């Protein structure tokens, strides 16, 4: 019985899951020419094009970019249509998946869960249809899942302004393509028009559905979180050598057309901005957003952590000091750091997860401790107070929907109700997501005269847009320059 967001159904040894992970790695870039070579070769556009043409992953990038064309069919919609022709009742499981996705944060972990559960649903229900080789034969790419579930949201209610919705999706695609191809410029998207957009009154989630989602699931995806990012620069301060070897051995044994993968970047194509970078103790993948999507226990801990920082004392301390003091107090109270000492490999600690502290306020175990150790004070500060994507994720997530289910005898009724009500409400407006996506792209682009002017113009309108939608964060001008 499909329940959605179920970690027990997605073990890290799942072949479907690892296949998706494999095709979310990029092929390594060719080595940079030596200084001697570059000194004798004049830098001009012809040489740059020639170097690009010789790139080992050019064909891969071209193929990945196909899904980022607005006039190309949605492959996920095509698969859904094929499944419905075979069995119309399949839509009930699909509707539950979409409903859970609707209240999930936009994180790599969320996308991995959604795409894996989708492929499991179609393979288990339709064994007579050959769905093998979807990635191998370039029938789908991970960007098909990006667009279908998180960008265009093909499953959601019909909007009144179809053309604006189409243009927003078009702009999202252009942003991803420019970062994927590592272009020097970001698409020039003017967001000033959104400042005068009439805000629709927010609808609330159906209370009837809320009443049905009362049974907590024993779901937790932290082991998967460590697995997917082990051996990458996302965990550059917490080594997982054995876990990394296990993962690389598993995915390299899969039948594929990939001869090599960019190990340190990890499955970066799962991220909203498919570009792996670290800057001032932050990474382009926020581990706290990932943790928020892992379980209700972890969501509640982050909620407690944020409130503790806000309530730390009545003096006018800087937020970074509040963060540091609160984390130090939590570590001192839980004592987990005394058990999980400095190790050269934390893989065993992940699988054992034998140390835990719990009281009336929060639960903290080895998994959360190691994530906090990796993110550090700056990472926590950025997540709670600086990054608009993190705040949008905090506004979007609904733990009662994501991590709860219903009694086994009622789950089919729940799926039918979700399907026929067709209420997939967007918590954060689509144009706000677009502006945030553009902001994240500006964080990773190399500054030049042209895009510096573009960023300055954008930030004026972006700051006003955030205020209009009640995003209370540190000045984005600081964040865009110092963090990723």
From Swiss-Prot:
Pfam families to which the protein is assigned, alphabetical: Herpes_env
GO MF entries: zinc ion binding
Positions of Zn(2+) 2 binding: 286, 289, 383, 390
Zinc finger 1, as annotated region: 74-154
Residues annotated for Zn(2+) 1 binding in this entry: 74, 77, 148, 154
A GO CC annotation given for this chain: host cell cytoplasm
Subcellular localization: Host cytoplasm; Host nucleus
InterPro entries: Herpes_env
Region span, Zinc finger 2: 286-390
Keywords: Host cytoplasm, Host nucleus, Metal-binding, Zinc, Zinc-finger
Origin: domain of life: Viruses
Subcellular location, principal: host cell
Function statement: Plays a role in efficient localization of neo-synthesized capsids to nuclear replication compartments, thereby controlling cleavage and packaging of virus genomic DNA.
Family as reported in the entry's similarity comment: Belongs to the herpesviridae UL32 protein family.
Name the record gives this protein: Packaging protein UL32
Phylogenetic placement of the source organism: Viruses, Duplodnaviria, Heunggongvirae, Peploviricota, Herviviricetes
Name of the gene: U36
């Amino acid at each position: 019985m499909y329940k959605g967001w179920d970690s027990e159904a997605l073990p890290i040894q799942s072949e479907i899951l690892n296949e998706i992970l494999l095709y979310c790695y990029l092929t390594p870039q060719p080595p940079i020419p030596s200084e001697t070579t570059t000194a004798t070769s004049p830098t001009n556009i012809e040489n740059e094009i020639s170097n690009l043409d010789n790139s080992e992953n050019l064909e891969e990038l071209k193929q990945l970019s196909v899904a980022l064309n607005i006039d190309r069919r949605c492959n996920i919609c095509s698969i859904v249509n094929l499944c419905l022709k075979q069995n119309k009742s399949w839509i009930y499981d699909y509707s539950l998946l979409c409903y859970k996705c609707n209240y999930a944060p936009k994180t790599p972990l969320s996308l991995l869960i959604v795409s894996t559960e989708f492929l499991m649903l179609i393979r288990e229900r339709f064994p007579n249809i050959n769905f093998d080789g979807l990635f191998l034969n370039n029938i789908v790419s991970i960007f098909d899942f990006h667009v279908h579930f998180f960008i265009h949201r093909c499953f959601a209610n019909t909007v009144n302004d179809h053309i604006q919705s189409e243009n927003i999706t078009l702009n999202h695609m252009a942003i991803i393509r420019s970062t994927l191809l590592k272009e020097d410029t970001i698409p020039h998207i003017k967001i000033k028009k959104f400042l005068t957009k009439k805000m629709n009154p927010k609808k609330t989630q159906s209370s009837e559905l809320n009443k049905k989602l009362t049974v907590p699931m024993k779901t937790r995806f932290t082991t998967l979180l460590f697995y997917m990012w082990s051996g990458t620069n996302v965990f550059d301060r917490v080594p997982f050598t054995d876990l990394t070897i296990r993962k690389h051995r598993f995915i390299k044994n899969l039948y594929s057309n990939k001869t090599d993968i960019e190990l340190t970047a990890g499955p970066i194509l799962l991220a909203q901005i498919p570009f792996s970078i670290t800057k001032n103790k932050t990474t382009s993948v926020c581990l706290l957003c990932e943790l928020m999507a892992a379980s209700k226990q972890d969501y509640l801990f982050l909620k407690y952590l944020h409130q503790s920082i806000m309530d730390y004392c009545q003096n006018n301390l800087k937020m970074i000091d509040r963060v540091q003091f609160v984390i130090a107090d939590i570590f001192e109270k839980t004592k987990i750091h005394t058990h999980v000492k400095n190790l050269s490999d934390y893989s065993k600690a992940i699988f054992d997860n034998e140390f835990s502290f719990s009281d009336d306020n929060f639960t903290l175990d080895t998994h959360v401790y190691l994530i906090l150790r990796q993110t550090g004070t700056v990472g926590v500060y950025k997540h709670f107070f600086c990054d608009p994507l993190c705040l949008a994720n905090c506004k979007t997530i609904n733990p009662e929907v994501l991590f709860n289910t219903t009694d086994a005898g009622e789950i089919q009724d729940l799926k039918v109700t979700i399907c026929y009500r067709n209420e997939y409400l967007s918590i954060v407006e689509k144009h706000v997501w677009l502006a945030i996506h553009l902001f994240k792209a500006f964080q990773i682009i190399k500054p030049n005269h042209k895009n510096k002017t573009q960023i300055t113009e954008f930030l004026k309108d972006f700051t006003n847009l955030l205020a209009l939608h009640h995003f209370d964060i540190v000045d984005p001008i600081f964040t865009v320059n110092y963090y990723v």
